[in-house]
Amino acid sequence: MRIVRIEQAGRRASAESIFVGPVDTQTVVDGGKDLRLIEVHFKSGARNKPHTHTTDQILVVTEGTGIVGAGGDEREVRPGDVAFIPAGEVHWHGAKEGHDMTHLAINGGTSQTTIEG
């Protein structure tokens, strides 16, 4: 068993090519057989590019206001909202303009991400 406390001080600016705009991330749980947990903090208007994962993904919004999009459908999300994205579905997520947004991303331990287009 492992207990991890998520603190803002653990966030680091991300240089990953999937992001558009300023985004901070921190890996919370990694190295598990089946799951990985990452905290992602999108600054106002920042988002990621449309992409897919090889495993299902769950996003749990913890702060702010954001948008999750897939297949032409865009939904506003706020703290307490949970988004389920099936493996292989092209999607994107990020902060609504004028707002920051933080979510926890729960992915399969072996999940691979592919940026679309």
Regions found by a protein language model. Give the residues of each.
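A short, N-terminal "cap"/entry segment at the start of jelly-roll beta-barrel domains
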Residues: 1-35, 114-117
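Conserved short histidine dyad/triad with adjacent acidic residue
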Residues: 22, 38-53, 87
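A short hydrophobic beta-strand segment most commonly corresponding to one strand
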Residues: 37, 84, 98-116
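Short, conserved beta-strand element in jelly-roll/cupin
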Residues: 40-43, 52-68, 106-108
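Short beta-strand His + acidic residue motifs that chelate non-heme Fe in jelly-roll/DSBH
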Residues: 48-50, 68-69, 85, 90-97
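Structural motif
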Residues: 58, 65-67, 74, 90, ...
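Short acidic-glycine-tyrosine-enriched beta hairpin
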Residues: 72-88
